[in-house]
UniProtKB/Swiss-Prot annotation:
One of its GO terms (biological process) is protein ubiquitination. Residues 187-231, 292-332 form the UBA domain. It comes from Mus musculus (Mouse). Residues 108-122 have a biased composition (Basic and acidic residues). Pathway: Protein modification; protein ubiquitination. Residues 245-268 have a biased composition (Low complexity). The gene is Ubac1. The UBA domains recognize and bind polyubiquitinated proteins. The lineage of its organism: Eukaryota, Metazoa, Chordata, Craniata, Vertebrata. Residues 101-122, 239-273 are annotated as: Disordered. Transmembrane segments: none annotated. Residues 357-396 form the STI1 domain. This is Ubiquitin-associated domain-containing protein 1. CDD domains: UBA1_KPC2 (cd14303), UBA2_KPC2 (cd14304), Ubl_KPC2 (cd17066).
Amino acid sequence: MFVQEEKIFAGKVLRLHICAADGAEWLEEATEDTSVEKLKESCLKHGAHGSLEDPKNVTHHKLIHAASERVLSDSKTILEENIQDQDVLLLIKKRVPSPLPKMADVSAEEKKKQEQKAPDKDAILRATANLPACSTDRTAVQTTMRDFQTELRKILVSLIEVAQKLLALNPDAVELFKKANAMLDEDEDERVDETALRQLTEMGFPESRASKALRLNHMSVPQAMEWLIEHSEDPAIDTPLPGHAAQAGASAAATTSSTSSEAAVGTSVEDEESRDELTEIFKKIRRKKEFRADARAVISLMEMGFDEKEVIDALRVNNNQQNAACEWLLGDRKPSPEELDQGIDPNSPLFQAILDNPVVQLGLTNPKTLLAFEDMLENPLNSTQWMNDPETGPVMLQISRIFQTLNRT
C-alpha cells in the first residue's frame, strides 16, 4: 500500500469553528502546522467566493481567538498560537485607516489658521506705519472719572444746607429735632458701659484707667483687663485719650452758649425765636455727630512721631482707616481737611439734577433724611445702614443713579 509522504508527516487535524462578521458559521479543518495566513485564505474562500482575486484582500482581514480575545499573527502556525480542537475563531475585516490629507487640504487648513490668528506687534506696526501719530493724554482721561464716595461728601454738605432751610419752614420741626437731640443724648457712643466699668473697678482697677481701657478696647472687658495689666507700669497710663478732654471742654462751652442764646432768643419775635431755636438744635446735633478719631489709631500714629492734630485730621480724611491715614500723612495730604467741609457747586449740572428729582425733593422735607446726611457726613461707614432704611434708602439710591449717569456722559 502506497501512502503519500506529506500525509505520513502531517500534524494533528483540528476542527475549528469559524464565525464571520455577517453571522455565517462553519467548521474549518486544518493541521497544527498550518499557518494562520493559510487558514485565513481557506476561510475567505469558504465565506466570500472570489474575494481572493484581490491579493490585498487577505491582508485586510484578521482572525481573532474568541476565548482569549487575541489577534492571531499571520506568520505563526496554529500550534504556535496554541489553538486547540473545537476552538472558536472570528474572521473580521480590518478597520481601514483614514486616508492622509492631501497637500492642498493641509495648505488650506494652515491658511485658515493663519487668517484667524491675532496680529502680533510687528504686524500692527506694519499696518499702521502710514497712519498719522495721535498722542492721548491718558492721565487726563482717567481723572475725569470722579469717585462717588469723594463727591458724595460734597453733595451731602450742600444737601444738608438745603434741608435745613426747608425744615426751618416746618412748624413742627423744632419738636421733631428736640426728640432727635434727646435720642442722641441717650445713645451717645462715648458713654462707657457701666456694667463693664463696675466689673473692672471691682477687680481693683481705678475708674479712670478702667474707662480708658474700655474705650480703647471697644467696651470688651477681657481685652480691657489685659490692656490694664500690660500697661500697669506705663507712666502714660493716666494720660487722657487724645481728643477726649477737648471734647469734654467743647461740650461744656456748647452748653453755656446754648443757655445764653436761649436767653437772648426770649426777647425776639416768635418766628425768629423758633428759627433760632432750630438753628441751635442743628448745632447741637452737629456737635454730637462730630468726628471721633479711633483712639488706638491715634496712639499708634503719634508713636510714629506725628502731631496729634495732624493724626486726627488724617483719620478724619480717611474715615478712621489707620493705614490710609499713615499714607496720607507721608504723602501730599490731599484732600485737605478744609476741603471736606466744602459743598458741591450749586450751579453744577449734577447738583441741579439731584434737586430736580422728585424723590430727593420729598426726602429733604423729612427730618430723618437730614439726620442721615449728618451721620454719613461724619461716619461714611454708616452709609450702608442708611441705604437699607425704607425712608432714606430711596433718596440715596436716586443720588447714586444720577451721579453714575452724569459721570458716564
